[in-house]
Regions:
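Conserved alpha/beta-hydrolase "acid-adjacent" motif
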Residues: 269-275
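Catalytic active-site module of serine/aspartate enzymes centered on a nucleophile-bearing elbow/loop
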Residues: 286-318
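N-terminal cap/lid segment of alpha/beta-hydrolase-fold proteins
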Residues: 19-31
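Alpha/beta-hydrolase
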Residues: 174-251, 278
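Short beta-strand/loop motif that positions the catalytic acidic residue
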Residues: 256, 262-264, 268
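Conserved hydrolase catalytic core segment
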Residues: 131-171
Length: 318
């Protein structure tokens, strides 16, 4: 009887855990893996990850903040990453040729488009029978969702765009120096697990907010766990080509009527701050939140800073 009593208390105090579920949404034969954290009675918010990012990359603190304030986070693996359908049968793109075309300003051909990836997110909310949801996206996820929102205005109550831009990367906006080399290495090379872990550490150090406390041992463990979850290393390359093959989305974002909060860090080495600010200026009904100390990631110092304005924005548009 005492065990039953404590079991009931555990369930009551962990209702979000009990209500979470996972599964696959079908998008015309492309299976998209999702996790619905619940609770199901809360306001849904769809989160869309960046380049090569599995759904496990979302900070636990962000998920907790959303749940604690009455929201229902729903995350998913973009196509060609994590447990969603991979496109490994197409092989790794020829990056010598593709980078040459990119630097010459010539059009690129991708296996799938950002518009295709946007339709994956719509498939997830359709599968869950959600008519309207809030939307939060980071980096490449922001590029995907610009098309998602522009083409499906009636499906979104609000839109949070973090560390992204409406411009297609070019020579002016492409990453420079060591970050560019690390991205090229991931695009070109088949590397060992140890090499991939070391590369991930170097990328994190560049993209993380300077104030972030870095536990290297825990980070290594997390990287290995994600590699074990999905070893589709070439998906990063195909997603990158989809970004470079896309057109500027200036016209699309100017047509967005959904209330929008754009968040961008002044220290971002991947997506220039000026491009984030310009994107906010192009979206008619938007608010721009500048974070002086932020690099590219939503790490703890950034989460602590944006929590209040983020929650207030979502609540105002619920």
């Amino acid at each position: 009887m005492r065990f039953l009593k404590w079991a009931i208390i555990f369930i009551l105090f962990n209702s979000a855990f009990v209500e979470s579920k996972e599964g696959y949404a079908d998008n015309d034969g492309v299976e998209i893996f999702y996790v619905d954290y619940g609770p199901i009675d809360n306001e849904p918010i769809l989160l869309v990850q960046g380049l090569g990012g599995q759904l496990t990359f979302w900070p636990d603190e962000l998920i907790s903040v959303l749940q604690d304030n009455g929201f229902r986070p729903i995350v998913y693996d973009n196509r060609d990453v994590g447990l969603s359908k991979n496109f490994e049968e197409y092989g790794r793109p020829n990056f010598v040729w593709n980078y040459a075309k990119f630097y010459l300003g010539l059009p690129l051909t991708s296996v799938y488009s950002l518009a295709d990836m946007a339709s994956d997110g719509i498939a997830v909310i359709n599968h869950l029978n959600i008519e309207q949801t809030h939307l939060l996206a980071q980096s490449m996820g922001g590029m995907i969702t610009q098309r998602m929102v522009a083409d499906n205005k009636d499906r979104f109550k609000s839109y949070v765009l973090i560390a992204s831009m409406a411009r297609t990367p070019d020579l002016k906006t492409a990453p420079k120096g060591e970050l560019r080399k690390l991205i090229e290495d991931r695009s070109f090379k088949n590397q060992s697990v140890d090499e991939r872990v070391e590369r991930s550490i170097e990328i994190f150090k560049i993209l993380a907010t300077p104030q972030t406390e870095f536990d290297e041992a825990a980070f290594r463990e997390e990287v290995i766990k994600n590699i074990n979850r999905s070893d589709n290393e070439s998906g990063f390359s195909r997603q990158l080509i989809a970004i470079l093959a896309d057109k500027d989305r200036y016209n699309e974002v100017q047509g967005i009527t959904t209330p929008t909060l754009v968040i961008h860090g002044k220290l971002d080495p991947l997506i220039p701050y000026e491009e984030g600010k310009k994107t906010a200026e192009l979206i008619p009904n938007s608010t721009f939140l500048s974070v002086d100390f932020m690099s590219h990631l939503i790490d703890k110092p950034v989460m602590d800073f944006i929590e209040k304005p983020l929650v207030e924005f979502l609540e105002e548009n619920s």
